[in-house]
């Protein structure tokens, strides 16, 4: 039995979340009556309202109205008034991943998992399949610039989704093709140990049907180890590793883009295909690897090399992934979602390769638990930044943890040899600090999953205003 076509109003609690908003939009486009609430007004809430979806700011029981089904994200507490009333009324309550899984049953599905790179890779897979005429439905964890949204209804037989492993619910998703970009220690508050994370990813691969396959990056040692433990399922490996089925070769990172070629070698004797002169308008080897994963899927689904080449060259990127927000005094300012040490290191390495000027990193650590559990890694992931400006921790509802805060990170960076790590007292002070640091050819990269994105977009104007005031 599949999701009924006739279903009463569906109420989303936390509809402004990036994952929830995408599901809500697709269900609205399928003809379901959708409504929802969020604690605060944001871009996604406004975007959904513009599409005719009834939205509420703030959580109140009366928002449920005549809803017959409630969808909740894992961020919603049990004492939420809307959730409490729904349970009092004995309404069905489903988690975000359960509803996503129901939508996936309508199509053949590609699910993109991994600690980092999921959103960009999901966007790239969607772009390549679209270029091949497959017209996929897409539900992503970030805004795809070409669509202006994180969700899109396609007329084709395929759906491409980002599979969020943070709470383990990605194991509910019925994928025909599974991508694993990497596996690092993250979300330990849920999993408890790195071994538990690795076990979850193994289960994710084991869940694919016998006619499906997994695309896995063997440049990452944990993923390569997992490949060796998977039995009875087809695996397509990718990476710079000379043993990869889809091998990334000759990566050239200059001018804010990536040039490379890819060699495809099937396990069938004698099969070999080389794609040369590939260009991705995004910097960083990590993004070239993401593109290689997407290319592997597109090739398997019959997309031509020329369509792949054209789509990669025209890729418009994803919001909050090395997104340029403006320029001041010849310095470029960027916004990036990177909040894990592996992500931060990759972004700063890409910035370093893209400019001959200085790289100034502005970081807002996200969650005390993440800073504490990965503290040593945070203290060593900023080597490619000439200057690191550390803002107060964005708590995301967590209580402070003694010894793991802004000042501890500044001290940790310095003790491990960084030459210029400084604390930011208030966001209002950022423009003045940058004005004394950045000049022509420099990159200012704002990093974090909190509200630092707002600082990144405000910074060019604030710097210009400072200049006018000084004049």
Swiss-Prot record:
ATP binds at residues 114-120. Keywords: ATP-binding, Cell cycle, Cell division, Cell shape, Cell wall biogenesis/degradation, Cytoplasm, Ligase, Nucleotide-binding, Peptidoglycan synthesis. Pathway: Cell wall biogenesis; peptidoglycan biosynthesis. InterPro entries: Mur-like_cat_sf, Mur_ligase_C, Mur_ligase_C_dom_sf, Mur_ligase_cen, Mur_ligase_N, MurCDEF_pg_biosynth, UDP-N-AcMur_Ala_ligase_MurC. Its EC number is 6.3.2.8. GO terms for biological process: cell division; cell wall organization; peptidoglycan biosynthetic process; regulation of cell shape. It holds the Pfam family Mur_ligase. GO terms for cellular component: cytoplasm. Its main location: cytoplasm. This is UDP-N-acetylmuramate--L-alanine ligase. The lineage of its organism: Bacteria, Pseudomonadati, Pseudomonadota, Alphaproteobacteria, Hyphomicrobiales. The gene is murC.
